[in-house]
Amino acid sequence: MTLASQIASDLLDIKAVYLKPEEPFTWASGIKSPIYTDNRITLSYPETRTLIENGFVKKIKEEFPEVEVIAGTATAGIPHGAIIADKMNLPFAYIRSKPKDHGAGNQIEGRVVKGEKMVVVEDLISTGGSVLDAVAAAEREGADVIGVVAIFTYELPKAEKNFAEAGVKLVTLSNYTELIKVAKVKGYITADGLRLLKKFKENQETWQD
């Protein structure tokens, strides 16, 4: 079993991911979605957590060997980022969604040295907007962001476009395509459910038509 399929399997088993193609969820953006993900739950399962952190370390060493500092997005990327930084013996910082409105008004907590090569850790990629905002904030502080890593991506075309336009490399441990394949094999969804889930990936607006 590949890392992507093992993580997909774990996410389903611990109910970090719910699939309900026949009774869709409504995302904050208003999109009706057959999938809902809460990767924070992975922190409560040591075996899954270890699988994820070891996967991150392996991917970062392969894809970004020149990394000098790990940063997590607030709040979901913080615990994973801190564990990764510890495993790799690297400095750690975290990036707020917006600057503090008191004190020094920091958006980045931790010391970032100008020009340091940074990898940003996120738990989930939908459109990529929030993590790319974090990347921009880190770069304003002088970091050289060489990439983003995440546990899971919905593989939405908008995310692909956003990362391409930002010129930021994205590496994920698992993805939507792998997850729905594993879900069908493990009996989490029916053949008709799989069809709807594939349609959602193709077009998030018309998949229910």
UniProtKB/Swiss-Prot annotation:
Keywords: Glycosyltransferase, Magnesium, Pyrimidine biosynthesis, Transferase. CDD domains: PRTases_typeI. 5-phospho-alpha-D-ribose 1-diphosphate binds at R96, K100, H102, E122, D123, L124, I125, S126, T127, G128, G129, S130. Pathway: Pyrimidine metabolism; UMP biosynthesis via de novo pathway; UMP from orotate: step 1/2. The keyword Glycosyltransferase applies. Gene3D superfamilies: 3.40.50.2020. Its EC number is 2.4.2.10. It catalyses: orotidine 5'-phosphate + diphosphate = orotate + 5-phospho-alpha-D-ribose 1-diphosphate. GO terms for biological process: 'de novo' UMP biosynthetic process; pyrimidine nucleobase biosynthetic process. Its cofactor is Mg(2+). Pfam families: Pribosyltran. Orotate binds at S126. One of its GO terms (molecular function) is magnesium ion binding. InterPro entries: OPRT, Or_phspho_trans_dom, PRibTrfase_dom, PRTase-like. It comes from the Bacteria. Homodimer. Belongs to the purine/pyrimidine phosphoribosyltransferase family. PyrE subfamily. Catalyzes the transfer of a ribosyl phosphate group from 5-phosphoribose 1-diphosphate to orotate, leading to the formation of orotidine monophosphate (OMP). This is Orotate phosphoribosyltransferase. The gene is pyrE.
